[in-house]
């Protein structure tokens, strides 16, 4: 399933801008992650650091009041500098189902690709996270690139006994 142009138009009507996060956005991003009820919630401190240190590879969508209503965080892999790793994507509940996550992901990867060579995108998704699976599968389809999946971290590697495996989604290569 891919996001239709109508979904992107509707998503754009839901926010005023997509831009890099600022440190002041850290608390709102933490709340959106917490309220998603699917993401592994990091400490509020880590979201502040993310906004400071990884703003160039992250993005927020802002609502009418300028506050974040969705975010995507990422980083460039140190050992593969042409690979963007998407760490987390979340949309505030009131704005879900309108193509906003897809618009954010497209905007972020376009911005990163404008600054450096981008050959692939990676993320990990647990098998029960169907929304993220749809998001990244449709992203690969929209950009007409391959999507490979393999278990990166088995569930037993995590200290919590209930953690599902993290499946690596490798998307690309993109035309350079």
UniProtKB/Swiss-Prot annotation:
It is an enzyme of class 2 (transferase). Residues 16-171 form the N-acetyltransferase domain. CDD domains: NAT_SF. GO terms for molecular function: diaminobutyrate acetyltransferase activity. Its EC number is 2.3.1.178. Gene3D superfamilies: 3.40.630.30. Signal peptide: none annotated. It holds the Pfam family Acetyltransf_1. Keywords: Acyltransferase, Transferase. One of its GO terms (biological process) is ectoine biosynthetic process. Pathway: Amine and polyamine biosynthesis; ectoine biosynthesis; L-ectoine from L-aspartate 4-semialdehyde: step 2/3. Belongs to the acetyltransferase family. EctA subfamily. This is L-2,4-diaminobutyric acid acetyltransferase. The lineage of its organism: Bacteria, Bacillati, Actinomycetota, Actinomycetes, Kitasatosporales.
